[in-house]
Amino acid sequence: MGFYQDRIVPHLVNLSMRNSRLAPYRERIASQGEGRVLEIGVGAGANLPLYTDRATEVLGVEPHPRLLNMAASKIGHVPTKLIEGSAESIPLDESSVDTVVTTWTLCTIPDIAKALTEMRRVLKPGGQLLFVEHGLSPDQGVRKWQDRLNPVWKKIAGGCNLNRPITDLIEAAGFRVSRLEKGYMQGPKPLTFMYEGTARRM
């Protein structure tokens, strides 16, 4: 990784993920984590203190070692293991977790289809994928701006994409979306169309 990706992006990620407007989304998602929980893209660990006693163990996978170092100080009361690795090749056995959590992660993973296939592989039958992500807006005017801005945004924001159709991608990987809430969060519309929901392994 270059200097910008290696040194600057981790701090930008940490700062952006501490936005107070994201906190209610995080709390809703983390509080639903049950059993053995796998968090994809644990980042600097913002979700770690939010898991409840419904979770018996949290496994946090993150490709960036600097972010993992930041996450270590955020571990809450639930037993937690931090793992350096990628979502496209999750270092866990098949059908080994009860819950997968992603919060503002699917926008950035390079091979999103492969990553979602991996998430499905490690989930137990009937296991749940809990997600909150920003992505493609249903409004044509906003979509045009997302498409225009995406090439530049992706470069400055560590690979983040503004225009991924989140639920379509999840369902294409073999999940059934059982709960979904969509809408704009406060802020520039190309950046703030949110998808929050639950999907089950089919």
Report residues per predicted region.
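Class I SAM-dependent methyltransferase SAM/SAH-binding core
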Residues: 38, 44-89
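Short alpha-helix
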Residues: 158-174
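A short acidic, Gly/Pro-enriched loop at the edge of an enzyme's catalytic core
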Residues: 88-100
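Conserved alpha-helix/loop element of class I SAM-dependent methyltransferases that forms part
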Residues: 16-36, 46-47
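Conserved beta-strand signature within the Rossmann-like core of class I S-adenosyl-L-methionine
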Residues: 126-134
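A short glycine-rich, Lys/Arg-flanked "PGG" loop and its adjoining helix->strand segment in the class I
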Residues: 113-125
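A short SAM/SAH-binding and catalytic strip from SAM-dependent methyltransferases
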Residues: 99-111
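Core SAM-dependent methyltransferase catalytic element
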Residues: 175, 182-202
